[in-house]
């Protein structure tokens, strides 16, 4: 995924990786680390907080919205299931003039309720809708399990 993001932004001087808390932000940190090893692009890491029970509540970011202006932004989450979290994350950025906007997910479940897609994905997993994908990040091991 890191190489795909790099190739898509090869001419950029700076990109923003916006990770949806909690696991999306951890994944964004890992992508940032990989990008810094393979490119000279300055990476701004940004956390995005979405109330998953009430996604209409205001989305919070740890950087000023003016920093998005005319930048290439990649919104990162761990799992794309129904698309609810990702679509509200996308909505947050629609009020700002961006140079480019892409999405990245580790696991794409293919059960979307909204017209949102992952531009960069680790794996596409077609499962029954009642199954749950759990992503666990740790210092030694990271894993994805189907429950």
Predicted features, each with a name:
Residues 1-147:
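PRPP-associated nucleotide enzymes
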């Amino acid at each position: 995924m890191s190489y795909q993001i790099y190739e898509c932004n090869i001419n950029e001087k700076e990109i923003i990786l916006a990770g949806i808390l909690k696991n999306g932000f951890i994944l964004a940190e890992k992508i940032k680390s990989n990008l810094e090893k393979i490119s000279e692009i300055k990476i701004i890491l940004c956390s995005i907080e979405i109330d998953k029970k009430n996604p209409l509540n205001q989305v919070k970011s740890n950087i000023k919205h003016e920093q998005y202006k005319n930048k290439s932004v990649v919104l990162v989450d761990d799992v794309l299931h129904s698309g609810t979290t990702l679509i509200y994350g996308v909505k947050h950025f629609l009020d700002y003039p961006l140079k480019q906007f892409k999405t990245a997910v580790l696991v794409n479940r293919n059960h979307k309720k909204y017209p949102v897609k992952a531009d960069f994905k680790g794996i596409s997993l077609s499962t029954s809708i009642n199954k749950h994908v759990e992503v666990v990040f740790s210092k030694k091991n990271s894993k994805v399990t189907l429950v």
